[in-house]
Amino acid sequence: MEHSRCLSCLILAALLSQVNPRALEVLEAEDKVILKCNSSITLLQGTAGQEVSDNKTLNLGKRIEDPRGMYQCGENAKSFTLQVYYRMCQNCVELDSATLAGLIITDIIATVLLALGVYCFAGHETGRFSRAADTQVLMGNDQLYQPLRERNDAQYSRLGDKWARNK
């Protein structure tokens, strides 16, 4: 449960230079965020909360609403400033070690099955002859060029019948 709380929200409490951590506290009660101070709390910027008791306790609202802002505890020269920033992860999935191991093992099995399928279908072609049988002799008798044939059977060969052809 503690891990899910750490993963579900991010609290950034940056105390400025003269801050006493005991003077201003951030409490999480159920699903609400509450600020407690020894003296009065003043909102500098951000989410305006509801005062709970005599301006020493401030309810910032629900954690799911991402309360954030700068708050000042005290009004004199010894005032403390606190910055609160909540960010709830609403679409997150808790990822523990068993889930991560399951994902990795499933990925490895799927990859092996895919490689096995490719090997079975593409690796063995039956009825295939050797490479020597694939080669054809295009021109016999060591000829460099193939002699041209007469072309009287083509579509446009009848147009030039009036002129003599050089053979």
Swiss-Prot record:
SUPFAM superfamilies: Immunoglobulin. Phosphorylated on Tyr residues after T-cell receptor triggering by LCK in association with CD4/CD8. SMART domains: ITAM. GO terms for cellular component: alpha-beta T cell receptor complex; external side of plasma membrane. CD3D is mostly present on T-lymphocytes with its TCR-CD3 partners. Present also in fetal NK-cells. Residues 122-167 are cytoplasmic. InterPro entries: CD3_esu/gsu/dsu, Ig-like_dom_sf, Ig-like_fold, Ig_4, Phos_immunorcpt_sig_ITAM. The modification Phosphotyrosine is found at residues 145, 156. It holds the Pfam family Ig_4. Gene3D superfamilies: Immunoglobulins (2.60.40.10), YojJ-like (1.10.287.770). Glycans are attached at residues 38, 55. One of its GO terms (biological process) is positive thymic T cell selection. Residues 134-162 form the ITAM domain. It comes from the Eukaryota. It is a single-pass type I membrane protein. The keyword Cell membrane applies. Disulfide bonds join 37-73. The TCR-CD3 complex is composed of a CD3D/CD3E and a CD3G/CD3E heterodimers that preferentially associate with TCRalpha and TCRbeta, respectively, to form TCRalpha/CD3E/CD3G and TCRbeta/CD3G/CD3E trimers. In turn, the hexamer interacts with CD3Z homodimer to form the TCR-CD3 complex. Alternatively, TCRalpha and TCRbeta can be replaced by TCRgamma and TCRdelta. Interacts with coreceptors CD4 and CD8. Part of the TCR-CD3 complex present on T-lymphocyte cell surface that plays an essential role in adaptive immune response. When antigen presenting cells (APCs) activate T-cell receptor (TCR), TCR-mediated signals are transmitted across the cell membrane by the CD3 chains CD3D, CD3E, CD3G and CD3Z. All CD3 chains contain immunoreceptor tyrosine-based activation motifs (ITAMs) in their cytoplasmic domain. Upon TCR engagement, these motifs become phosphorylated by Src family protein tyrosine kinases LCK and FYN, resulting in the activation of downstream signaling pathways. This is T-cell surface glycoprotein CD3 delta chain. It comes from Ovis aries (Sheep). The gene is CD3D.
